[in-house]
């Protein structure tokens, strides 16, 4: 009876417990089921704890290149020779700001998020930029790219204004040029490159085409029914299904290819009027970086993973998804239970043949060439990558908080320094008055320290749970998964032992009563006198 109560108490608690890897494993199981993999049931799903290879990259399909949305981050820099021209330059900048509300957004966090990432499969599209003095983000080998677009390394884009054109919206006179191997693309006359309806015309006016241009079909990424088309006017990719009508899905405001090429460009605002003269020296420069707006998608550049590409980036990149290493083992294998404790104790290693998740899916062959048959699998796979993106966002918020606090405190310190210099102007400033070196002390905010303290507490909690032996929940869950199949039969046997004697006694009494009743009926029939009258002849 005590064991039954223990099972009834622990079962809801253990059912509510969720291992930290459960979201990823659940998404992996959904992915296996959606692709009809033979490993969707009766198998082991294992995650790797190795830090040498933090994950695997999976390239996006050609159709996803037409649907994943990008965004631009704009900052500007004044020309150092603006002495005496700040007033008209500010007037011009205020006009531009009204037409471009994204100016001076909070800059994204650049740099590789992960390194030593392995790209599985062949990327359908890659983009190469070779800029002088550019920021190298990583380079994919040409052998893993099906089609490679190269951004013109020598192009510089300028925007010229007259005094009467200040009220007009700025845009690129021409898009950044991209080149590709001769004979790679085919001219196609189609209605899809004339421009689809877009809800962001007034916001992203730099992408308005100056005139209509025919599309170029990418043959080795297309099929007879589905085309992948390139519009060189806007550096945009379109997907067209020839078996359907013209009213197909709209494309994003800023596509990945457009954002990647724009981020390699240079834009300067150069007013030309009787006030400024005819010089084409830009008054200020725009620095444009690009990020992927679709959560879970990343730039894959060599073995590095990026959320954003900086201004004037250089390298060879594609887009795709990232997941931690998840392996599959057949369900008939007996896996050893990991034991937490002294990590220095030797552990016996068993030769277990693990299958990578992507190999178990059987969809790698279709990513680099075709565009059909993997839509559902790719969508489910992207959910795995979103789990990583959420963790990255959390780290990014902490780093952003650090940057904001440093900027805020630096402004306060500089303001106080100016005030002290004014009070001690007669002595030549505070530094000369004290006859000391000018030093600054920036006191870090407690908000940042609280975030770091929480991270440390979480890490400490994980270490404690890993060293508590079999009493910790994580270890309990691991051995409980082995015991779980035996709980049902054990509970059934326990119930049988508890209520079996009672049931047996009831059955015995019922049988005895029925036998007694039959016996009484038989005895009564034998003692009754016969009432038979003989008929006379």
UniProtKB/Swiss-Prot annotation:
CDD domains tied to this protein: HTLV-1-like_HR1-HR2
Coiled-coil zones: none
Signal peptide residue numbers: 1-15
Main location: virion
UniProt motif (CKS-17) ranges: 414-430
GO biological process annotation, one example: syncytium formation
Residues that span the membrane, as ranges: 479-499
Residue numbers covered by motif CXXC: 43-46
Record comment regarding domains: The CKS-17 immunosuppressive domain is present in many retroviral envelope proteins. As a synthetic peptide, it inhibits immune function in vitro and in vivo.
UniProt name for this protein: Syncytin-2
Encoding gene (name): ERVFRD-1
